[in-house]
Amino acid sequence: MTQAITVEESRELDDKTINKIGIPSLVLMERAGLKIYENMLDNKDLDLSNVLILAGTGNNGGDGLVVARLLATHGYQVSILTVGNPDHASEDHLAQARICNYYQIPKVFMNADFNKFTTLVDALFGSGLSRNVGGDFATIIDKANASTAKIHAIDIPSGLNGDTGDVMGTAIKAISTSTVAYPKVGMLKDQAKPYTGKIYVDDIGIYRGNAFENE
């Protein structure tokens, strides 16, 4: 079985890769987006004829925006729904949003009919979720699960606890998930399996050694 890591170990690997080794976070985001795009092409259970990216305002959402651009530039029909406070958006998310604006990728809003889309990409939360999902995020997750579209999740299905695999109020039910370097331990728990679907583990250049080695 593929080795799994905790959420804290994942944070430490990210920190070492970006701040000690020196690979820029935006480079990692581009690599992640390309791998996710390739995973989606690989999964023949996904119909990519009309895709909606559900993007939070953090770096998980930024990964989703890279996927949106790659789909658009390869001729796929794709739209973006951004959920969350734009005033709290990460710098890398804002950079990807500007690129999507350049390519004039359509935006939709909370009242969009999800049933008209064939695939939804869950880029709402990463693995660091520590409290129950509420508000607009819970509304979007429940709406996505109730739709006829199939869902591909980025990093971990939004609403799952990365360490325990427990549902934090509500969670995306994906048919496939792209995660980087290692899966989180919670993703391999029995209770998480109905939510993760097929798991793709992608190498994007994250440091894969011992996160706790002596410097």
From Swiss-Prot:
Domain YjeF N-terminal, chain residue ranges per copy:
10-212
Q: Where does (6S)-NADPHX bind?
A: 59-63, 126-132, 155
Q: Which residues bind K(+)?
A: 60, 122, 158
Q: Which GO terms describe its molecular function?
A: metal ion binding; NAD(P)HX epimerase activity; nucleotide binding
Known catalytic reactions: (6R)-NADHX = (6S)-NADHX; (6R)-NADPHX = (6S)-NADPHX
Q: Which domain of life is it from?
A: Bacteria
Task: Tell me if Nucleus is a UniProt keyword of this record.
Answer: no
* SUPFAM superfamilies cross-referenced by the UniProt entry: YjeF N-terminal domain-like
- UniProt keyword ATP-binding present: no
Cofactor(s) needed, names only, are:
K(+)
* EC number from the UniProt entry: 5.1.99.6
> What is the UniProt remark on how the cofactor binds and its stoichiometry?
Binds 1 potassium ion per subunit.
Q: Which UniProt keywords apply?
A: Isomerase, Metal-binding, NAD, NADP, Nucleotide-binding, Potassium
**A Pfam family this chain is assigned to:** YjeF_N
Stated family: Belongs to the NnrE/AIBP family.
Q: What is the recorded function of this protein according to its Swiss-Prot or TrEMBL entry?
A: Catalyzes the epimerization of the S- and R-forms of NAD(P)HX, a damaged form of NAD(P)H that is a result of enzymatic or heat-dependent hydration. This is a prerequisite for the S-specific NAD(P)H-hydrate dehydratase to allow the repair of both epimers of NAD(P)HX.
Protein name per its UniProtKB record: NAD(P)H-hydrate epimerase
